[in-house]
Design a protein with these regions (language model features):
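Compact, glycine-rich, soluble single-domain proteins
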Residues: 2, 7-35, 39-44, 58-60
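Loop/turn positions that initiate beta-strands
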Residues: 52-55
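A short glycine-centered flexible hinge/capping loop motif at secondary-structure junctions
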Residues: 63-64
């Protein structure tokens, strides 16, 4: 699978929320596209990510 263009070695399917946490992302502060489609945050726990999927992750940072 790829995350932000970088190949990530993973041998099995995993839910999006678990994958993001294992990769160090704060799931409360990110938006994710899976294969070009936005994944609603409410579906992170039920969205399966396979070895051929490509993810784009955007982190939100507060500021002022």
């Amino acid at each position: 699978m790829k995350i932000n263009g970088k190949e990530i070695p993973y041998e099995k399917e995993v839910t999006l929320d678990i994958l993001m946490e294992k990769q160090g992302f704060d799931i409360k502060k990110i938006a994710v596209m899976k294969n070009g489609e936005i994944v609603p945050k409410a579906e992170f726990g039920s969205t399966m990510i396979g070895t051929e999927d490509s993810l784009e992750v955007v982190s939100f940072v507060g500021g002022g």
